[in-house]
Amino acid sequence: MKHFSVKACAKINLGLLITSRRDDGYHTLETIFAPIEWHDTLEFTESDKIGMECTNLDLPVDDTNLCIRAAKALQDYAGISKGVSMKLVKRVPFGAGLGGGSSDAAATLNALCRLWEIDVPSAVLHRLAVKLGADVPYFLEMKGLAYASGIGEELEDLSLALPWHVVTVFPEVQVPTAWAYKNFHRQFERPVPDLKALVRRLCDDRDLSVLDAFENDFGSVVFENYPVVSQVRDTLEASGAQFVSLSGSGSAVYALFENRALADETAEEMAGKFRVNVTPAGFRME
């Protein structure tokens, strides 16, 4: 009986600029995705049906779960009746803007191609991923920094890794994505900076002067309405970090540090109140 486990890493957004609202209600955006070491573990075992258990009992394991949906979508595409027993060891907070559920779904697609021994064209996997969630393709296809546009599904591999240590803090509150999109302050008419060029200057040249361009359009409304998220931001800004930002629509906040010892010290101080992760400089997903 085949059995193996895989990691499903989270992400942060370096800048998140919402550029328009489409007729179908979705918003277009530009962002830089960067992976962080904070990860879930998924275990896959051959079975005669699709089933799942999770270490976090607050997460449903029915057809609303992205891993179950990913497995059934792949099963339907391949026209097979094989099953899988999945166990999700959940570490990445949900409702945090870290893409944990999307990463789990992407890991499921990749793992089941291996477990079920099916050869699925990359274009088909991409389409299945987009149907599951706009940022699922990032976790499916990329290892390091990527530029994303459209609704987040149009990707360009930048072949870069962040040269800073990343401290990511979950303030123990969830920000509903739908609420964030309904309430953010629209700036559709503003000129959009060239995020790809700026992130190359940031990573290749260590040009810290470009950091102010990496705004997150959800930041102001989330900080205004969630005092604990604002508190986490203020603490990180006072710690000596080079840059502090909301990730996605929140609630997680991250900080970039040049000095690993300072990153570890800051994380240790905050770990008494919040869940915290430190990702080393140069990190890429496996």
From Swiss-Prot:
The active site is at 11, 135. GO terms for biological process: isopentenyl diphosphate biosynthetic process, methylerythritol 4-phosphate pathway; terpenoid biosynthetic process. Keywords: ATP-binding, Isoprene biosynthesis, Kinase, Nucleotide-binding, Transferase. Pathway: Isoprenoid biosynthesis; isopentenyl diphosphate biosynthesis via DXP pathway; isopentenyl diphosphate from 1-deoxy-D-xylulose 5-phosphate: step 3/6. ATP binds at residues 93-103. It catalyses: 4-CDP-2-C-methyl-D-erythritol + ATP = 4-CDP-2-C-methyl-D-erythritol 2-phosphate + ADP + H(+). It comes from the Bacteria. InterPro entries: GHMP_kinase_C_dom, GHMP_kinase_C_sf, GHMP_kinase_N_dom, IspE, Ribosomal_Su5_D2-typ_SF, Ribsml_uS5_D2-typ_fold_subgr. Its EC number is 2.7.1.148. It is an enzyme of class 2 (transferase). GO terms for molecular function: 4-(cytidine 5'-diphospho)-2-C-methyl-D-erythritol kinase activity; ATP binding. NCBIfam families: ispE. Catalyzes the phosphorylation of the position 2 hydroxy group of 4-diphosphocytidyl-2C-methyl-D-erythritol. Belongs to the GHMP kinase family. IspE subfamily. PANTHER family: 4-DIPHOSPHOCYTIDYL-2-C-METHYL-D-ERYTHRITOL KINASE, CHLOROPLASTIC. This is 4-diphosphocytidyl-2-C-methyl-D-erythritol kinase. It comes from Chlorobaculum parvum (strain DSM 263 / NCIMB 8327). The lineage of its organism: Bacteria, Pseudomonadati, Chlorobiota, Chlorobiia, Chlorobiales.
